[in-house]
């Protein structure tokens, strides 16, 4: 068992939301909620599965942001975690309540623009976000 710090990679001007959910349909539901709440929003979303092949599911409206979210999700590698990269000019305050109200979303760890490190706990059987 060990701890690891994973730095979130992103341009300085971008905001992101890091959270935890419990169902593979999370990606589709977050995507639909965002485009409904903020028409024209630019975002990339990635979700780490926690069982089976432990795939990373992704979606979004901007290919570069989708790839950035996927890269960060792969680095974090914690089951049931998701990362939502918001395009320049879009802020968590505009979508945070929408995301929190999605039934699959269990919680939000953070929603900053600041440089961020995520503390990961690895048991050898899986990884989890400590904070």
Set out the residue ranges of the language-model regions.
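Long, charge-patterned amphipathic alpha-helical coiled-coil/hairpin "stalk" segments used as oligomerization
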Residues: 55-131
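N-terminal, charge-rich interaction modules
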Residues: 1-58
């Amino acid at each position: 068992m060990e701890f690891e710090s994973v730095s979130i990679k992103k341009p300085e001007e971008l905001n992101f939301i890091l959270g935890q959910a419990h169902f593979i349909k999370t990606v589709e539901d977050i995507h639909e909620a965002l485009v409904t709440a903020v028409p024209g929003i630019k975002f990339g979303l990635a979700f780490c599965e926690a069982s089976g092949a432990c795939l990373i599911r992704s979606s979004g409206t901007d290919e570069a942001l989708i790839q950035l979210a996927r890269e960060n999700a792969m680095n974090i590698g914690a089951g049931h975690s998701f990362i939502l990269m918001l395009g320049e000019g879009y802020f968590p305050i505009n979508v945070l309540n929408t995301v929190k109200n999605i039934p699959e979303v269990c919680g939000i760890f953070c929603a900053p623009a600041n440089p961020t490190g995520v503390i990961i706990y690895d048991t050898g059987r899986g990884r989890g976000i400590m904070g």
